[in-house]
Amino acid sequence: MQLDKGLFVAFEGPDACGKSTVSKLVYQKLINFFNNKDSVILTREPGGTEVGEKIREILVNYDIDPRTEALLFAASRTEHVWNVILKAKANKKIILCDRFIHSSLVYQGIVKNLGYKNVYKVNQFGISKIKPDIVFYFSANPKVLLERKTKDKDRDIFDRLDNQYAQEENLKKIIGGYSSILQFDNRNVIRLDALKPVEELANKICATILERVR
């Protein structure tokens, strides 16, 4: 089935909100719907390209200055946008991206006190005004997120960043940061209750995506 147009979708939220699990299920559901795995791309940030994955390894394995961290995230994102996302969208594909610029604005800009405007400027140099057509934000109570984090042993780069701020008050800072950033431009933001069943969330997201591409 040929799509009428491409669509760039980002999944955002604090660690343990369930967005990665849901995005993978959405990917499988869309592939089954179109009966064509080439119609949908599941990708992530940092990463998504060979260069991006190398940068991800650095971010995971080294403790670095927040400014360096912000620049590395921006570099990975620049490669990702120009070599994967825009090309896929031009070819009328659906791009499902686990995190995008919002994560940098929150984690480096607000949590690490670099200033979200400074982080935004760095990213704009690399990606211009490219932004997702839809941002699904997974909202959850800090206490619930902490409970999930203690149960899940499979940690990654943003999980490491979160672990530096694992106390409930600092999780509130992360969630508050998302609220501030998403208010900055909320025209394409859809808020989801992360406590809803995974299947229910995936079905809602798929329905929204299909409305946009047909």
UniProtKB/Swiss-Prot annotation:
Catalytic reaction list = dTMP + ATP = dTDP + ADP
- Key word Ribosomal protein present: no
Q: Which residues does the record give as ATP binding sites?
A: 13-20
**Which SUPFAM superfamilies has this protein been placed in?**
P-loop containing nucleoside triphosphate hydrolases
For this UniProt record, the keywords arranged alphabetically read as follows: ATP-binding, Kinase, Nucleotide biosynthesis, Nucleotide-binding, Transferase
Function, in words:
Phosphorylation of dTMP to form dTDP in both de novo and salvage pathways of dTTP synthesis.
User: Can you say what this protein is called?
Assistant: Thymidylate kinase
Q: Which organism is it from?
A: Malacoplasma penetrans (strain HF-2) (Mycoplasma penetrans)
